[in-house]
Amino acid sequence: MKIELVQLAGRDGDTAYNLSRTLNAIATCAGDTDLLVFPETYLSGFVGGAQLAQVAEPLHGTTLQTLLQAVRQRDVAVVLGFAEVHQGRFYNSSVLVTPEGIALQYRKTHLWPSERSDFSPGDRFTTVLWRGVRVGLLICYDIELPETSRALAQLGAEVVIVTNGNMDPYGPVHRTAIMARAQENQLFAVMVNRVGAGDDGLVFAGGSMAVDPFGRVLFEAGRDEVRHVVELDLDQLKAARRDYDYLKDRRLMLSGEQTEHPDGRRELLIGASQ
């Protein structure tokens, strides 16, 4: 599987600009690319307050429909984030968009402190089978909580994709976390961060990474814009679990209702008390 990490700067609240950059990346990707990954809330940027209501869109809104058309034209898939509105609530969401449609939606379950006054947390973890590989999504702060990636591993994830919006001075935290999450679950982890300046004096830390099931770094970006393709050797999944398998050896299961849907999605619901 060939995955392009698309580490870009963006504009907060400027969906048209961010969408234009996204479409250009799709149009110019290599012909054998399977998947492009963009940063957290890349389409909308980071917004809050009254501005959030102006830029947030429903799951099947016009921006994602435009994105879907581009995905179909190139026969690739895309993972990226946006500010979602649903039934009057706002969510920090990421989606896996394939030529067949929106294959997977994930709402950030662990909100950063400054987000909690604007966004509602998601209530489930989800994986889906895509091109023979089971994929799960996480968003930024999620990866600092080991239970999030373990939930996806419990749902059979082989590749965890993280849309990231990590800023200074926390870059080293996510560098450590993404390697740990890959190694302790014996799966691939791909994290794509934003770069450049944001609103309110934020400076995004870059450092997008791809890590193999042994916790070894396959690629690590710097602090500038970059597009880089990594090819995942899926045989490494079996190799990492040959001598010991953490999921089989563990004695503690994560709680929550687990469901498998006819379309292949697997979900683990977070209990009301959690």
From Swiss-Prot:
Disulfide bond residue pairs: none
Reaction catalysed by this enzyme: (R)-piperazine-2-carboxamide + H2O = (R)-piperazine-2-carboxylate + NH4(+); beta-alaninamide + H2O = beta-alanine + NH4(+)
The protein's job, in short, is: Hydrolyzes (R)-piperazine-2-carboxamide and (R)-piperazine-2-tert-butylcarboxamide with strict R-stereoselectivity. Also active towards beta-alaninamide, piperidine-3-carboxmide, D-glutaminamide and slightly active towards L-glutaminamide and piperidine-4-carboxamide.
Activity relative to temperature: Optimum temperature is 45 degrees Celsius, activity decreases rapidly above 45 degrees Celsius possibly due to instability at higher temperatures. Inactivated following 10 minutes incubation at 55 degrees Celsius, and only retains 2.6% of activity after 10 minutes incubation at 50 degrees Celsius.
Q: CDD domains in the record, alphabetically? A: R-amidase_like
EC identifiers of the protein:
3.5.1.100
EC class: hydrolase
Q: Which domain of life is it from?
A: Bacteria
> One Pfam family for this entry, by name?
CN_hydrolase
* Protein name as catalogued: (R)-stereoselective amidase
Q: How does it assemble?
A: Monomer.
This protein's UniProt keywords: Hydrolase
- pH dependence comment: Optimum pH is 8.0. Stable from pH 6.0 to 9.0.
Q: Which residues form the active site?
A: 40, 108, 140
Q: Record's SUPFAM superfamilies? A: Carbon-nitrogen hydrolase (SSF56317)
Q: How is its activity regulated?
A: Completely inhibited by p-chloromercuribenzoate, N-ethylmaleimide, MnSO(4), MnCl(2), CoCl(2), NiCl(2), CuSO(4), CuCl(2), ZnSO(4), ZnCl(2), AgNO(3), CdCl(2), HgCl(2) and PbCl(2). Partially inhibited by FeCl(3) and Fe(NH(4))(2)(SO(4))(2). Slightly enhanced by dithiothreitol. Unaffected by LiBr, H(2)BO(3), NaCl, MgSO(4), MgCl(2), AlCl(3), KCl, CaCl(2), CrCl(3), RbCl, Na(2)MoO(4), (NH(4))(6)Mo(7)O(24), CsCl and BaCl(2). Unaffected by the chelating agents o-phenanthroline, 8-hydroxyquinoline, enthylenediaminetetraacetic acid and alpha,alpha'-dipyridyl.
Q: Which GO terms describe its molecular function?
A: hydrolase activity
- Signal peptide residues are none
Domain CN hydrolase span(s) in chain numbering: 1-234
